UniProtKB/Swiss-Prot annotation:
The gene is lpp1. This is Major outer membrane lipoprotein Lpp 1. It comes from the Bacteria. Residues 68-78 have a biased composition (Polar residues). Induction: This gene is probably the major expressed form.
Length: 78
């Protein structure tokens, strides 16, 4: 039991020391990278949303053009 506690304590101490070895500069750099990536994701999301409205407008125009063609085709058949 004492040996288990000793090993467990050593593992906890070792992990604490390893966590303390990371520098603040590296953490700040990673945080900055994450913020940059989040900004890019937001921009891409906005671009996709803008394209959705453009695609919908193109679909609507195509549907109107097809309807006009269908109307012309029925006039020629009569």
């Amino acid at each position: 039991m004492n040996r288990t506690k000793l090993v467990l304590g050593a593992v906890i101490l070792g992990s604490t020391l390893l966590a303390g070895c990371s520098s603040n500069a590296k953490i700040d750099q990673l945080s900055s990278d994450v913020q940059t990536l989040n900004a890019k994701v937001d921009q891409l999301s906005n671009d996709v949303n803008a394209m959705r409205s453009d695609v919908q407008a193109a679909k609507d125009d195509a549907a109107r053009a097809n309807q006009r063609l269908d109307n012309q085709a029925t006039k020629y058949r009569k």
